[in-house]
């Protein structure tokens, strides 16, 4: 183990475990590793667009491992050992469980972190989304075509650039003039709408100044300043 003092009463910690070469490791959230088995991969422990880390894995050797240190860090799954690194924590904290199946291991994990409620039926239906629908008419026409063809459409997603300025968190009225009518029409089709908020805020947005004043922005990844 490595336990080095840092600023603000924090420590840089590293913990190594022996790992057999034939072990297969799965999990760790959403990471573009190019494969399912994480053996041989290095996972950076931070969140960003299209990278969503959950520091929990299951092993073909019958155990699950949760790295319970909320800080920037790294997980290294080498041929002969596994190393967990935290760049700023107050103690080394991890949880290990075992089971006869992956399902049993995952059940133990949920016992300590919380069980997710069952999704409503509509949420397991077909979701239609693309990077951008430019206008309300374009968005509605896609849903109407689904209906004309008799295809089920559970959720229709309004994604990128539906705003005037990013961070407004409302539809641009120049291109989405009547949201209430749009919602009513899709509701009559049995389709729900989901809007992807895109949580960036540009300086031209009406929300930038009040959020900046209240210190609501996150900092850079190294914690040195606001973004």
Sequence positions of predicted segments:
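Aromatic-lined carbohydrate-binding/catalytic grooves of carbohydrate-active enzymes
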Residues: 117-227
């Amino acid at each position: 183990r490595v336990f080095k003092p840092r600023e603000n009463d924090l420590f840089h910690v590293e913990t190594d475990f022996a790992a057999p070469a034939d072990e297969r490791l799965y999990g760790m959230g959403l990471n573009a590793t190019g494969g399912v088995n994480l053996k041989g991969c290095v996972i950076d422990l931070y969140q960003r667009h299209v990278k969503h880390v959950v520091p929990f894995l299951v092993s073909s050797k019958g155990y699950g491992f949760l790295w319970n240190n909320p800080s920037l860090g790294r997980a290294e799954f080498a041929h002969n050992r596994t190393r967990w690194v935290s760049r700023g924590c107050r103690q080394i904290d991890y949880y290990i469980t075992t089971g006869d199946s992956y399902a049993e291991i995952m059940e133990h994990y949920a016992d300590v972190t919380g069980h997710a409620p069952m999704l409503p039926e509509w949420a397991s239906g077909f979701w239609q989304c693309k990077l951008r629908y430019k206008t309300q008419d374009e968005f509605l026409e896609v849903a109407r075509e689904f209906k004309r063809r008799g295809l089920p459409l559970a959720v229709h997603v309004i994604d990128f650039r539906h705003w005037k300025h990013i961070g407004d968190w409302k539809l641009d009225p120049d291109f989405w003039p009547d949201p209430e009518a749009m919602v009513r029409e899709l509701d009559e089709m049995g389709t729900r709408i989901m809007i992807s908020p895109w949580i960036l805020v540009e300086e031209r947005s009406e929300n930038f100044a009040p959020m900046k004043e209240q210190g609501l922005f996150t900092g850079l990844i190294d914690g040195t300043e606001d973004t």
